[in-house]
Regions:
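Surface-exposed, low-hydrophobicity beta-strand/loop segments enriched in small/polar/acidic residues
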Residues: 1-136
Length: 136
């Protein structure tokens, strides 16, 4: 399965090892959040997120490598086709698909790039975002 988000711009990616609950599976490219002090897959209600650098199969240890901060750009997919008006706007993520939720503006964990190449008008793919509210 292709990664939901891919890093496209980072001079130096800072990462940390964070605790994860046994039995939790996280795929490479997933966004993650914190629940009860442990890393979980991010959902629409997540108020801060990080990027999962490596896949973490269920029952494969108690730590996971995630990004620290937000000094990098991600490429992801929107749940609708991109429009120029989406540049610079903050959005949520969708629960099940981890796409950029154009209709969601509650937690605003992602911010669409203001660059000319932030997305292709009429296409939902390859939209550039930054984590707007990093875990740490």
């Amino acid at each position: 399965m292709a990664a939901k988000f891919v890093i496209t711009n980072s001079e130096r990616l800072r990462t940390i090892m964070a605790p994860i609950a046994t039995g939790t599976a996280i795929e490479y490219g997933d966004l993650v959040a914190v629940s009860s002090g442990l890393i979980v897959k991010a959902a629409a209600a997540s108020t801060a997120v990080a990027y999962c650098v490596k896949a973490h199969p269920a029952n494969s240890g108690t730590q996971i490598q995630i990004t620290e901060g937000n000094d990098f750009t991600l490429r992801g997919t929107m749940d609708v086709v991109f429009a120029a008006a989406y540049r610079g706007v903050e959005y949520d993520i969708n629960d099940t698909t981890q796409t950029i939720d154009q209709g969601g503006t509650t937690t605003k964990v992602l911010k669409v790039s203001i660059a000319e190449d932030a997305g292709v008008v009429g296409s939902a793919s390859n939209v550039l975002v930054r984590i707007n509210k990093p875990i740490f």
